């Protein structure tokens, strides 16, 4: 059986076992609730106060997600854009090098056959314009036919009841007539445009035929060069379209990023405005009253002091209206003076405000008589209500 040893504090510890050190003067600490999953090392992490947790707007998380998504998309698309531009420049350099090599082998026949291939390019463009003009003309003709059918229906509705003119059908007829006129103008415009581009296309085709007859030998010798050039041109156009599409994607992602950032700024401004609205316009606490001897404003007059001032003002008014009479009781004057001093002491922040006051008035009741004589103005009237106090301790 293990031998037990007596240790301070009344506990027994078996021999050979360690016992915890006992600090008698140690003050027990209140348990601190740990955050779930945070561990003991998270005490240095910043924690939100309850007020900040209440004021967190759920839109912040949503806008932050939009911001992160836009940022990731910008990074990815910019990498793709850099690769596409690099590929475009590489293909452009290779095509220029191969074309220069091919041109050095063929010689002057390339320059002789160049007008023919240029005329072919213009003829192809004119043919495409002719097709577009034909589509516009067909669309205008369809609109014109639909407008004429609408006019026909409106006329039938108007003529259905000959004895009464329906304003609804009349309005529909006027609207359909306007549509017919607009469609007719569009049809005529499309017809003239189609005729113009058709003439240009015919002229381009005629020029191609003429150059083909004139430059038959040079065209045959330079055909490999221009075919290779057409292949490279098509490849470059495809890569250029890809670069343009990636640039548009980057611009759209940056627009979304700026919108999310602007929304976060607006939310932050709204939160700060709400916080400023919750705070009181003036700091809380007792208001500082006017010092002794200063003219008290209407807002500085307290409830406790109004009764004393009213009593004193009434005494002054009675003294001035009745003229010289018997002196008031000494006990009454002393009581009024003591109340005045007590009120002044309550209104002041410290006794330092009482320094420098006049010593001509004491607590023996001379104050009321002196003030009653000095309150009379040049016109014989007496100022009532507010008065200036001068007290010495």
Curated annotation (Swiss-Prot):
GO molecular function: guanyl-nucleotide exchange factor activity; protein kinase inhibitor activity
Annotated region (Disordered), positions in chain: 1-59, 272-332, 364-393
Compositional bias of kind Basic and acidic residues: 18-28
Ranges annotated as biased composition (Low complexity): 317-332
InterPro entries: SH3BP5
Compositional bias segments (type: Gly residues): 304-313
GO BP annotations, alphabetical order: intracellular signal transduction
Modified residues (Phosphoserine): 30, 49, 343, 350, 358, 362, 378
Coiled-coil features, chain-numbered ranges: 59-140, 169-272
Phosphothreonine sites (modified residues): 13
Ranges of Basic residues composition bias in the record: 384-393
Keywords: Coiled coil, Guanine-nucleotide releasing factor, Phosphoprotein
Pfam family, one: SH3BP5
Domain of life: Eukaryota
Any GO CC annotation of this UniProt entry: cytoplasm
Alphabetical list of PANTHER family matching this protein: SH3 DOMAIN-BINDING PROTEIN 5, SH3 DOMAIN-BINDING PROTEIN 5-LIKE
Protein role: Functions as a guanine nucleotide exchange factor (GEF) for RAB11A.
Entry similarity comment: Belongs to the SH3BP5 family.
Protein name as catalogued: SH3 domain-binding protein 5-like
Organism: Pongo abelii (Sumatran orangutan)
Gene label: SH3BP5L
């Amino acid at each position: 059986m293990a031998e037990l040893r007596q240790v301070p504090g009344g506990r027994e510890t078996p021999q050979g076992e360690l016992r915890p050190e006992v600090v008698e003067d140690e003050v027990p600490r209140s348990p601190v609730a740990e955050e779930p999953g945070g561990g003991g090392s998270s005490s240095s992490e910043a924690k939100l106060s309850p007020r900040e947790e209440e004021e967190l707007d759920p839109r912040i998380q949503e806008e932050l997600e939009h911001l992160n998504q836009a940022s990731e998309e910008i990074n990815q698309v910019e990498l793709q854009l850099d690769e596409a531009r690099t590929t475009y420049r590489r293909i452009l350099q290779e095509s220029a090098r191969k074309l220069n090599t091919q041109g050095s082998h063929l010689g002057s026949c390339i320059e002789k056959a160049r007008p023919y291939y240029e005329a072919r390019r213009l003829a192809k463009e004119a043919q495409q314009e002719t097709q577009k003009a034909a589509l516009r003309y067909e669309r205008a003709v369809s609109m014109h036919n639909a407008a004429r059918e609408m006019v026909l229906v409106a006329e039938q509705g108007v003529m259905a009841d000959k004895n009464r003119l329906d304003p609804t059908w009349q309005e529909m007829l006027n609207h359909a007539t306007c549509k017919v006129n607009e469609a007719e103008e569009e049809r005529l415009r499309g017809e003239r445009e189609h005729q113009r581009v058709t003439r240009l296309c015919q002229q381009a085709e005629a020029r191609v035929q003429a150059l083909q007859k004139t430059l038959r030998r040079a065209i045959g010798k330079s055909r490999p060069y221009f075919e290779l050039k057409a292949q490279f041109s098509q490849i470059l156009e495809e890569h250029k379209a890809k670069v343009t599409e990636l640039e548009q994607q980057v611009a759209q992602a940056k627009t979304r990023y700026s919108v999310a950032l602007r929304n976060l700024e607006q939310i932050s401004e709204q939160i700060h405005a709400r916080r400023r609205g919750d705070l009181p316009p003036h700091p809380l606490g007792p208001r500082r009253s006017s010092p002794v001897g200063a003219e008290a404003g209407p807002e500085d007059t307290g409830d406790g002091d109004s009764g004393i001032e009213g009593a004193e003002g009434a005494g002054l008014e009675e003294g001035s209206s009745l003229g010289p009479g018997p002196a008031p009781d000494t006990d009454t004057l002393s009581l009024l003076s003591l109340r005045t001093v007590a009120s002044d002491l309550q209104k002041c922040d410290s006794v330092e405000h009482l320094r420098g006051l006049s010593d001509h008035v004491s607590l023996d009741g001379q104050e009321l008589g002196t003030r009653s004589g000095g309150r009379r103005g040049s016109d014989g009237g007496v100022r009532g209500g507010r008065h200036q106090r001068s007290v010495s301790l």
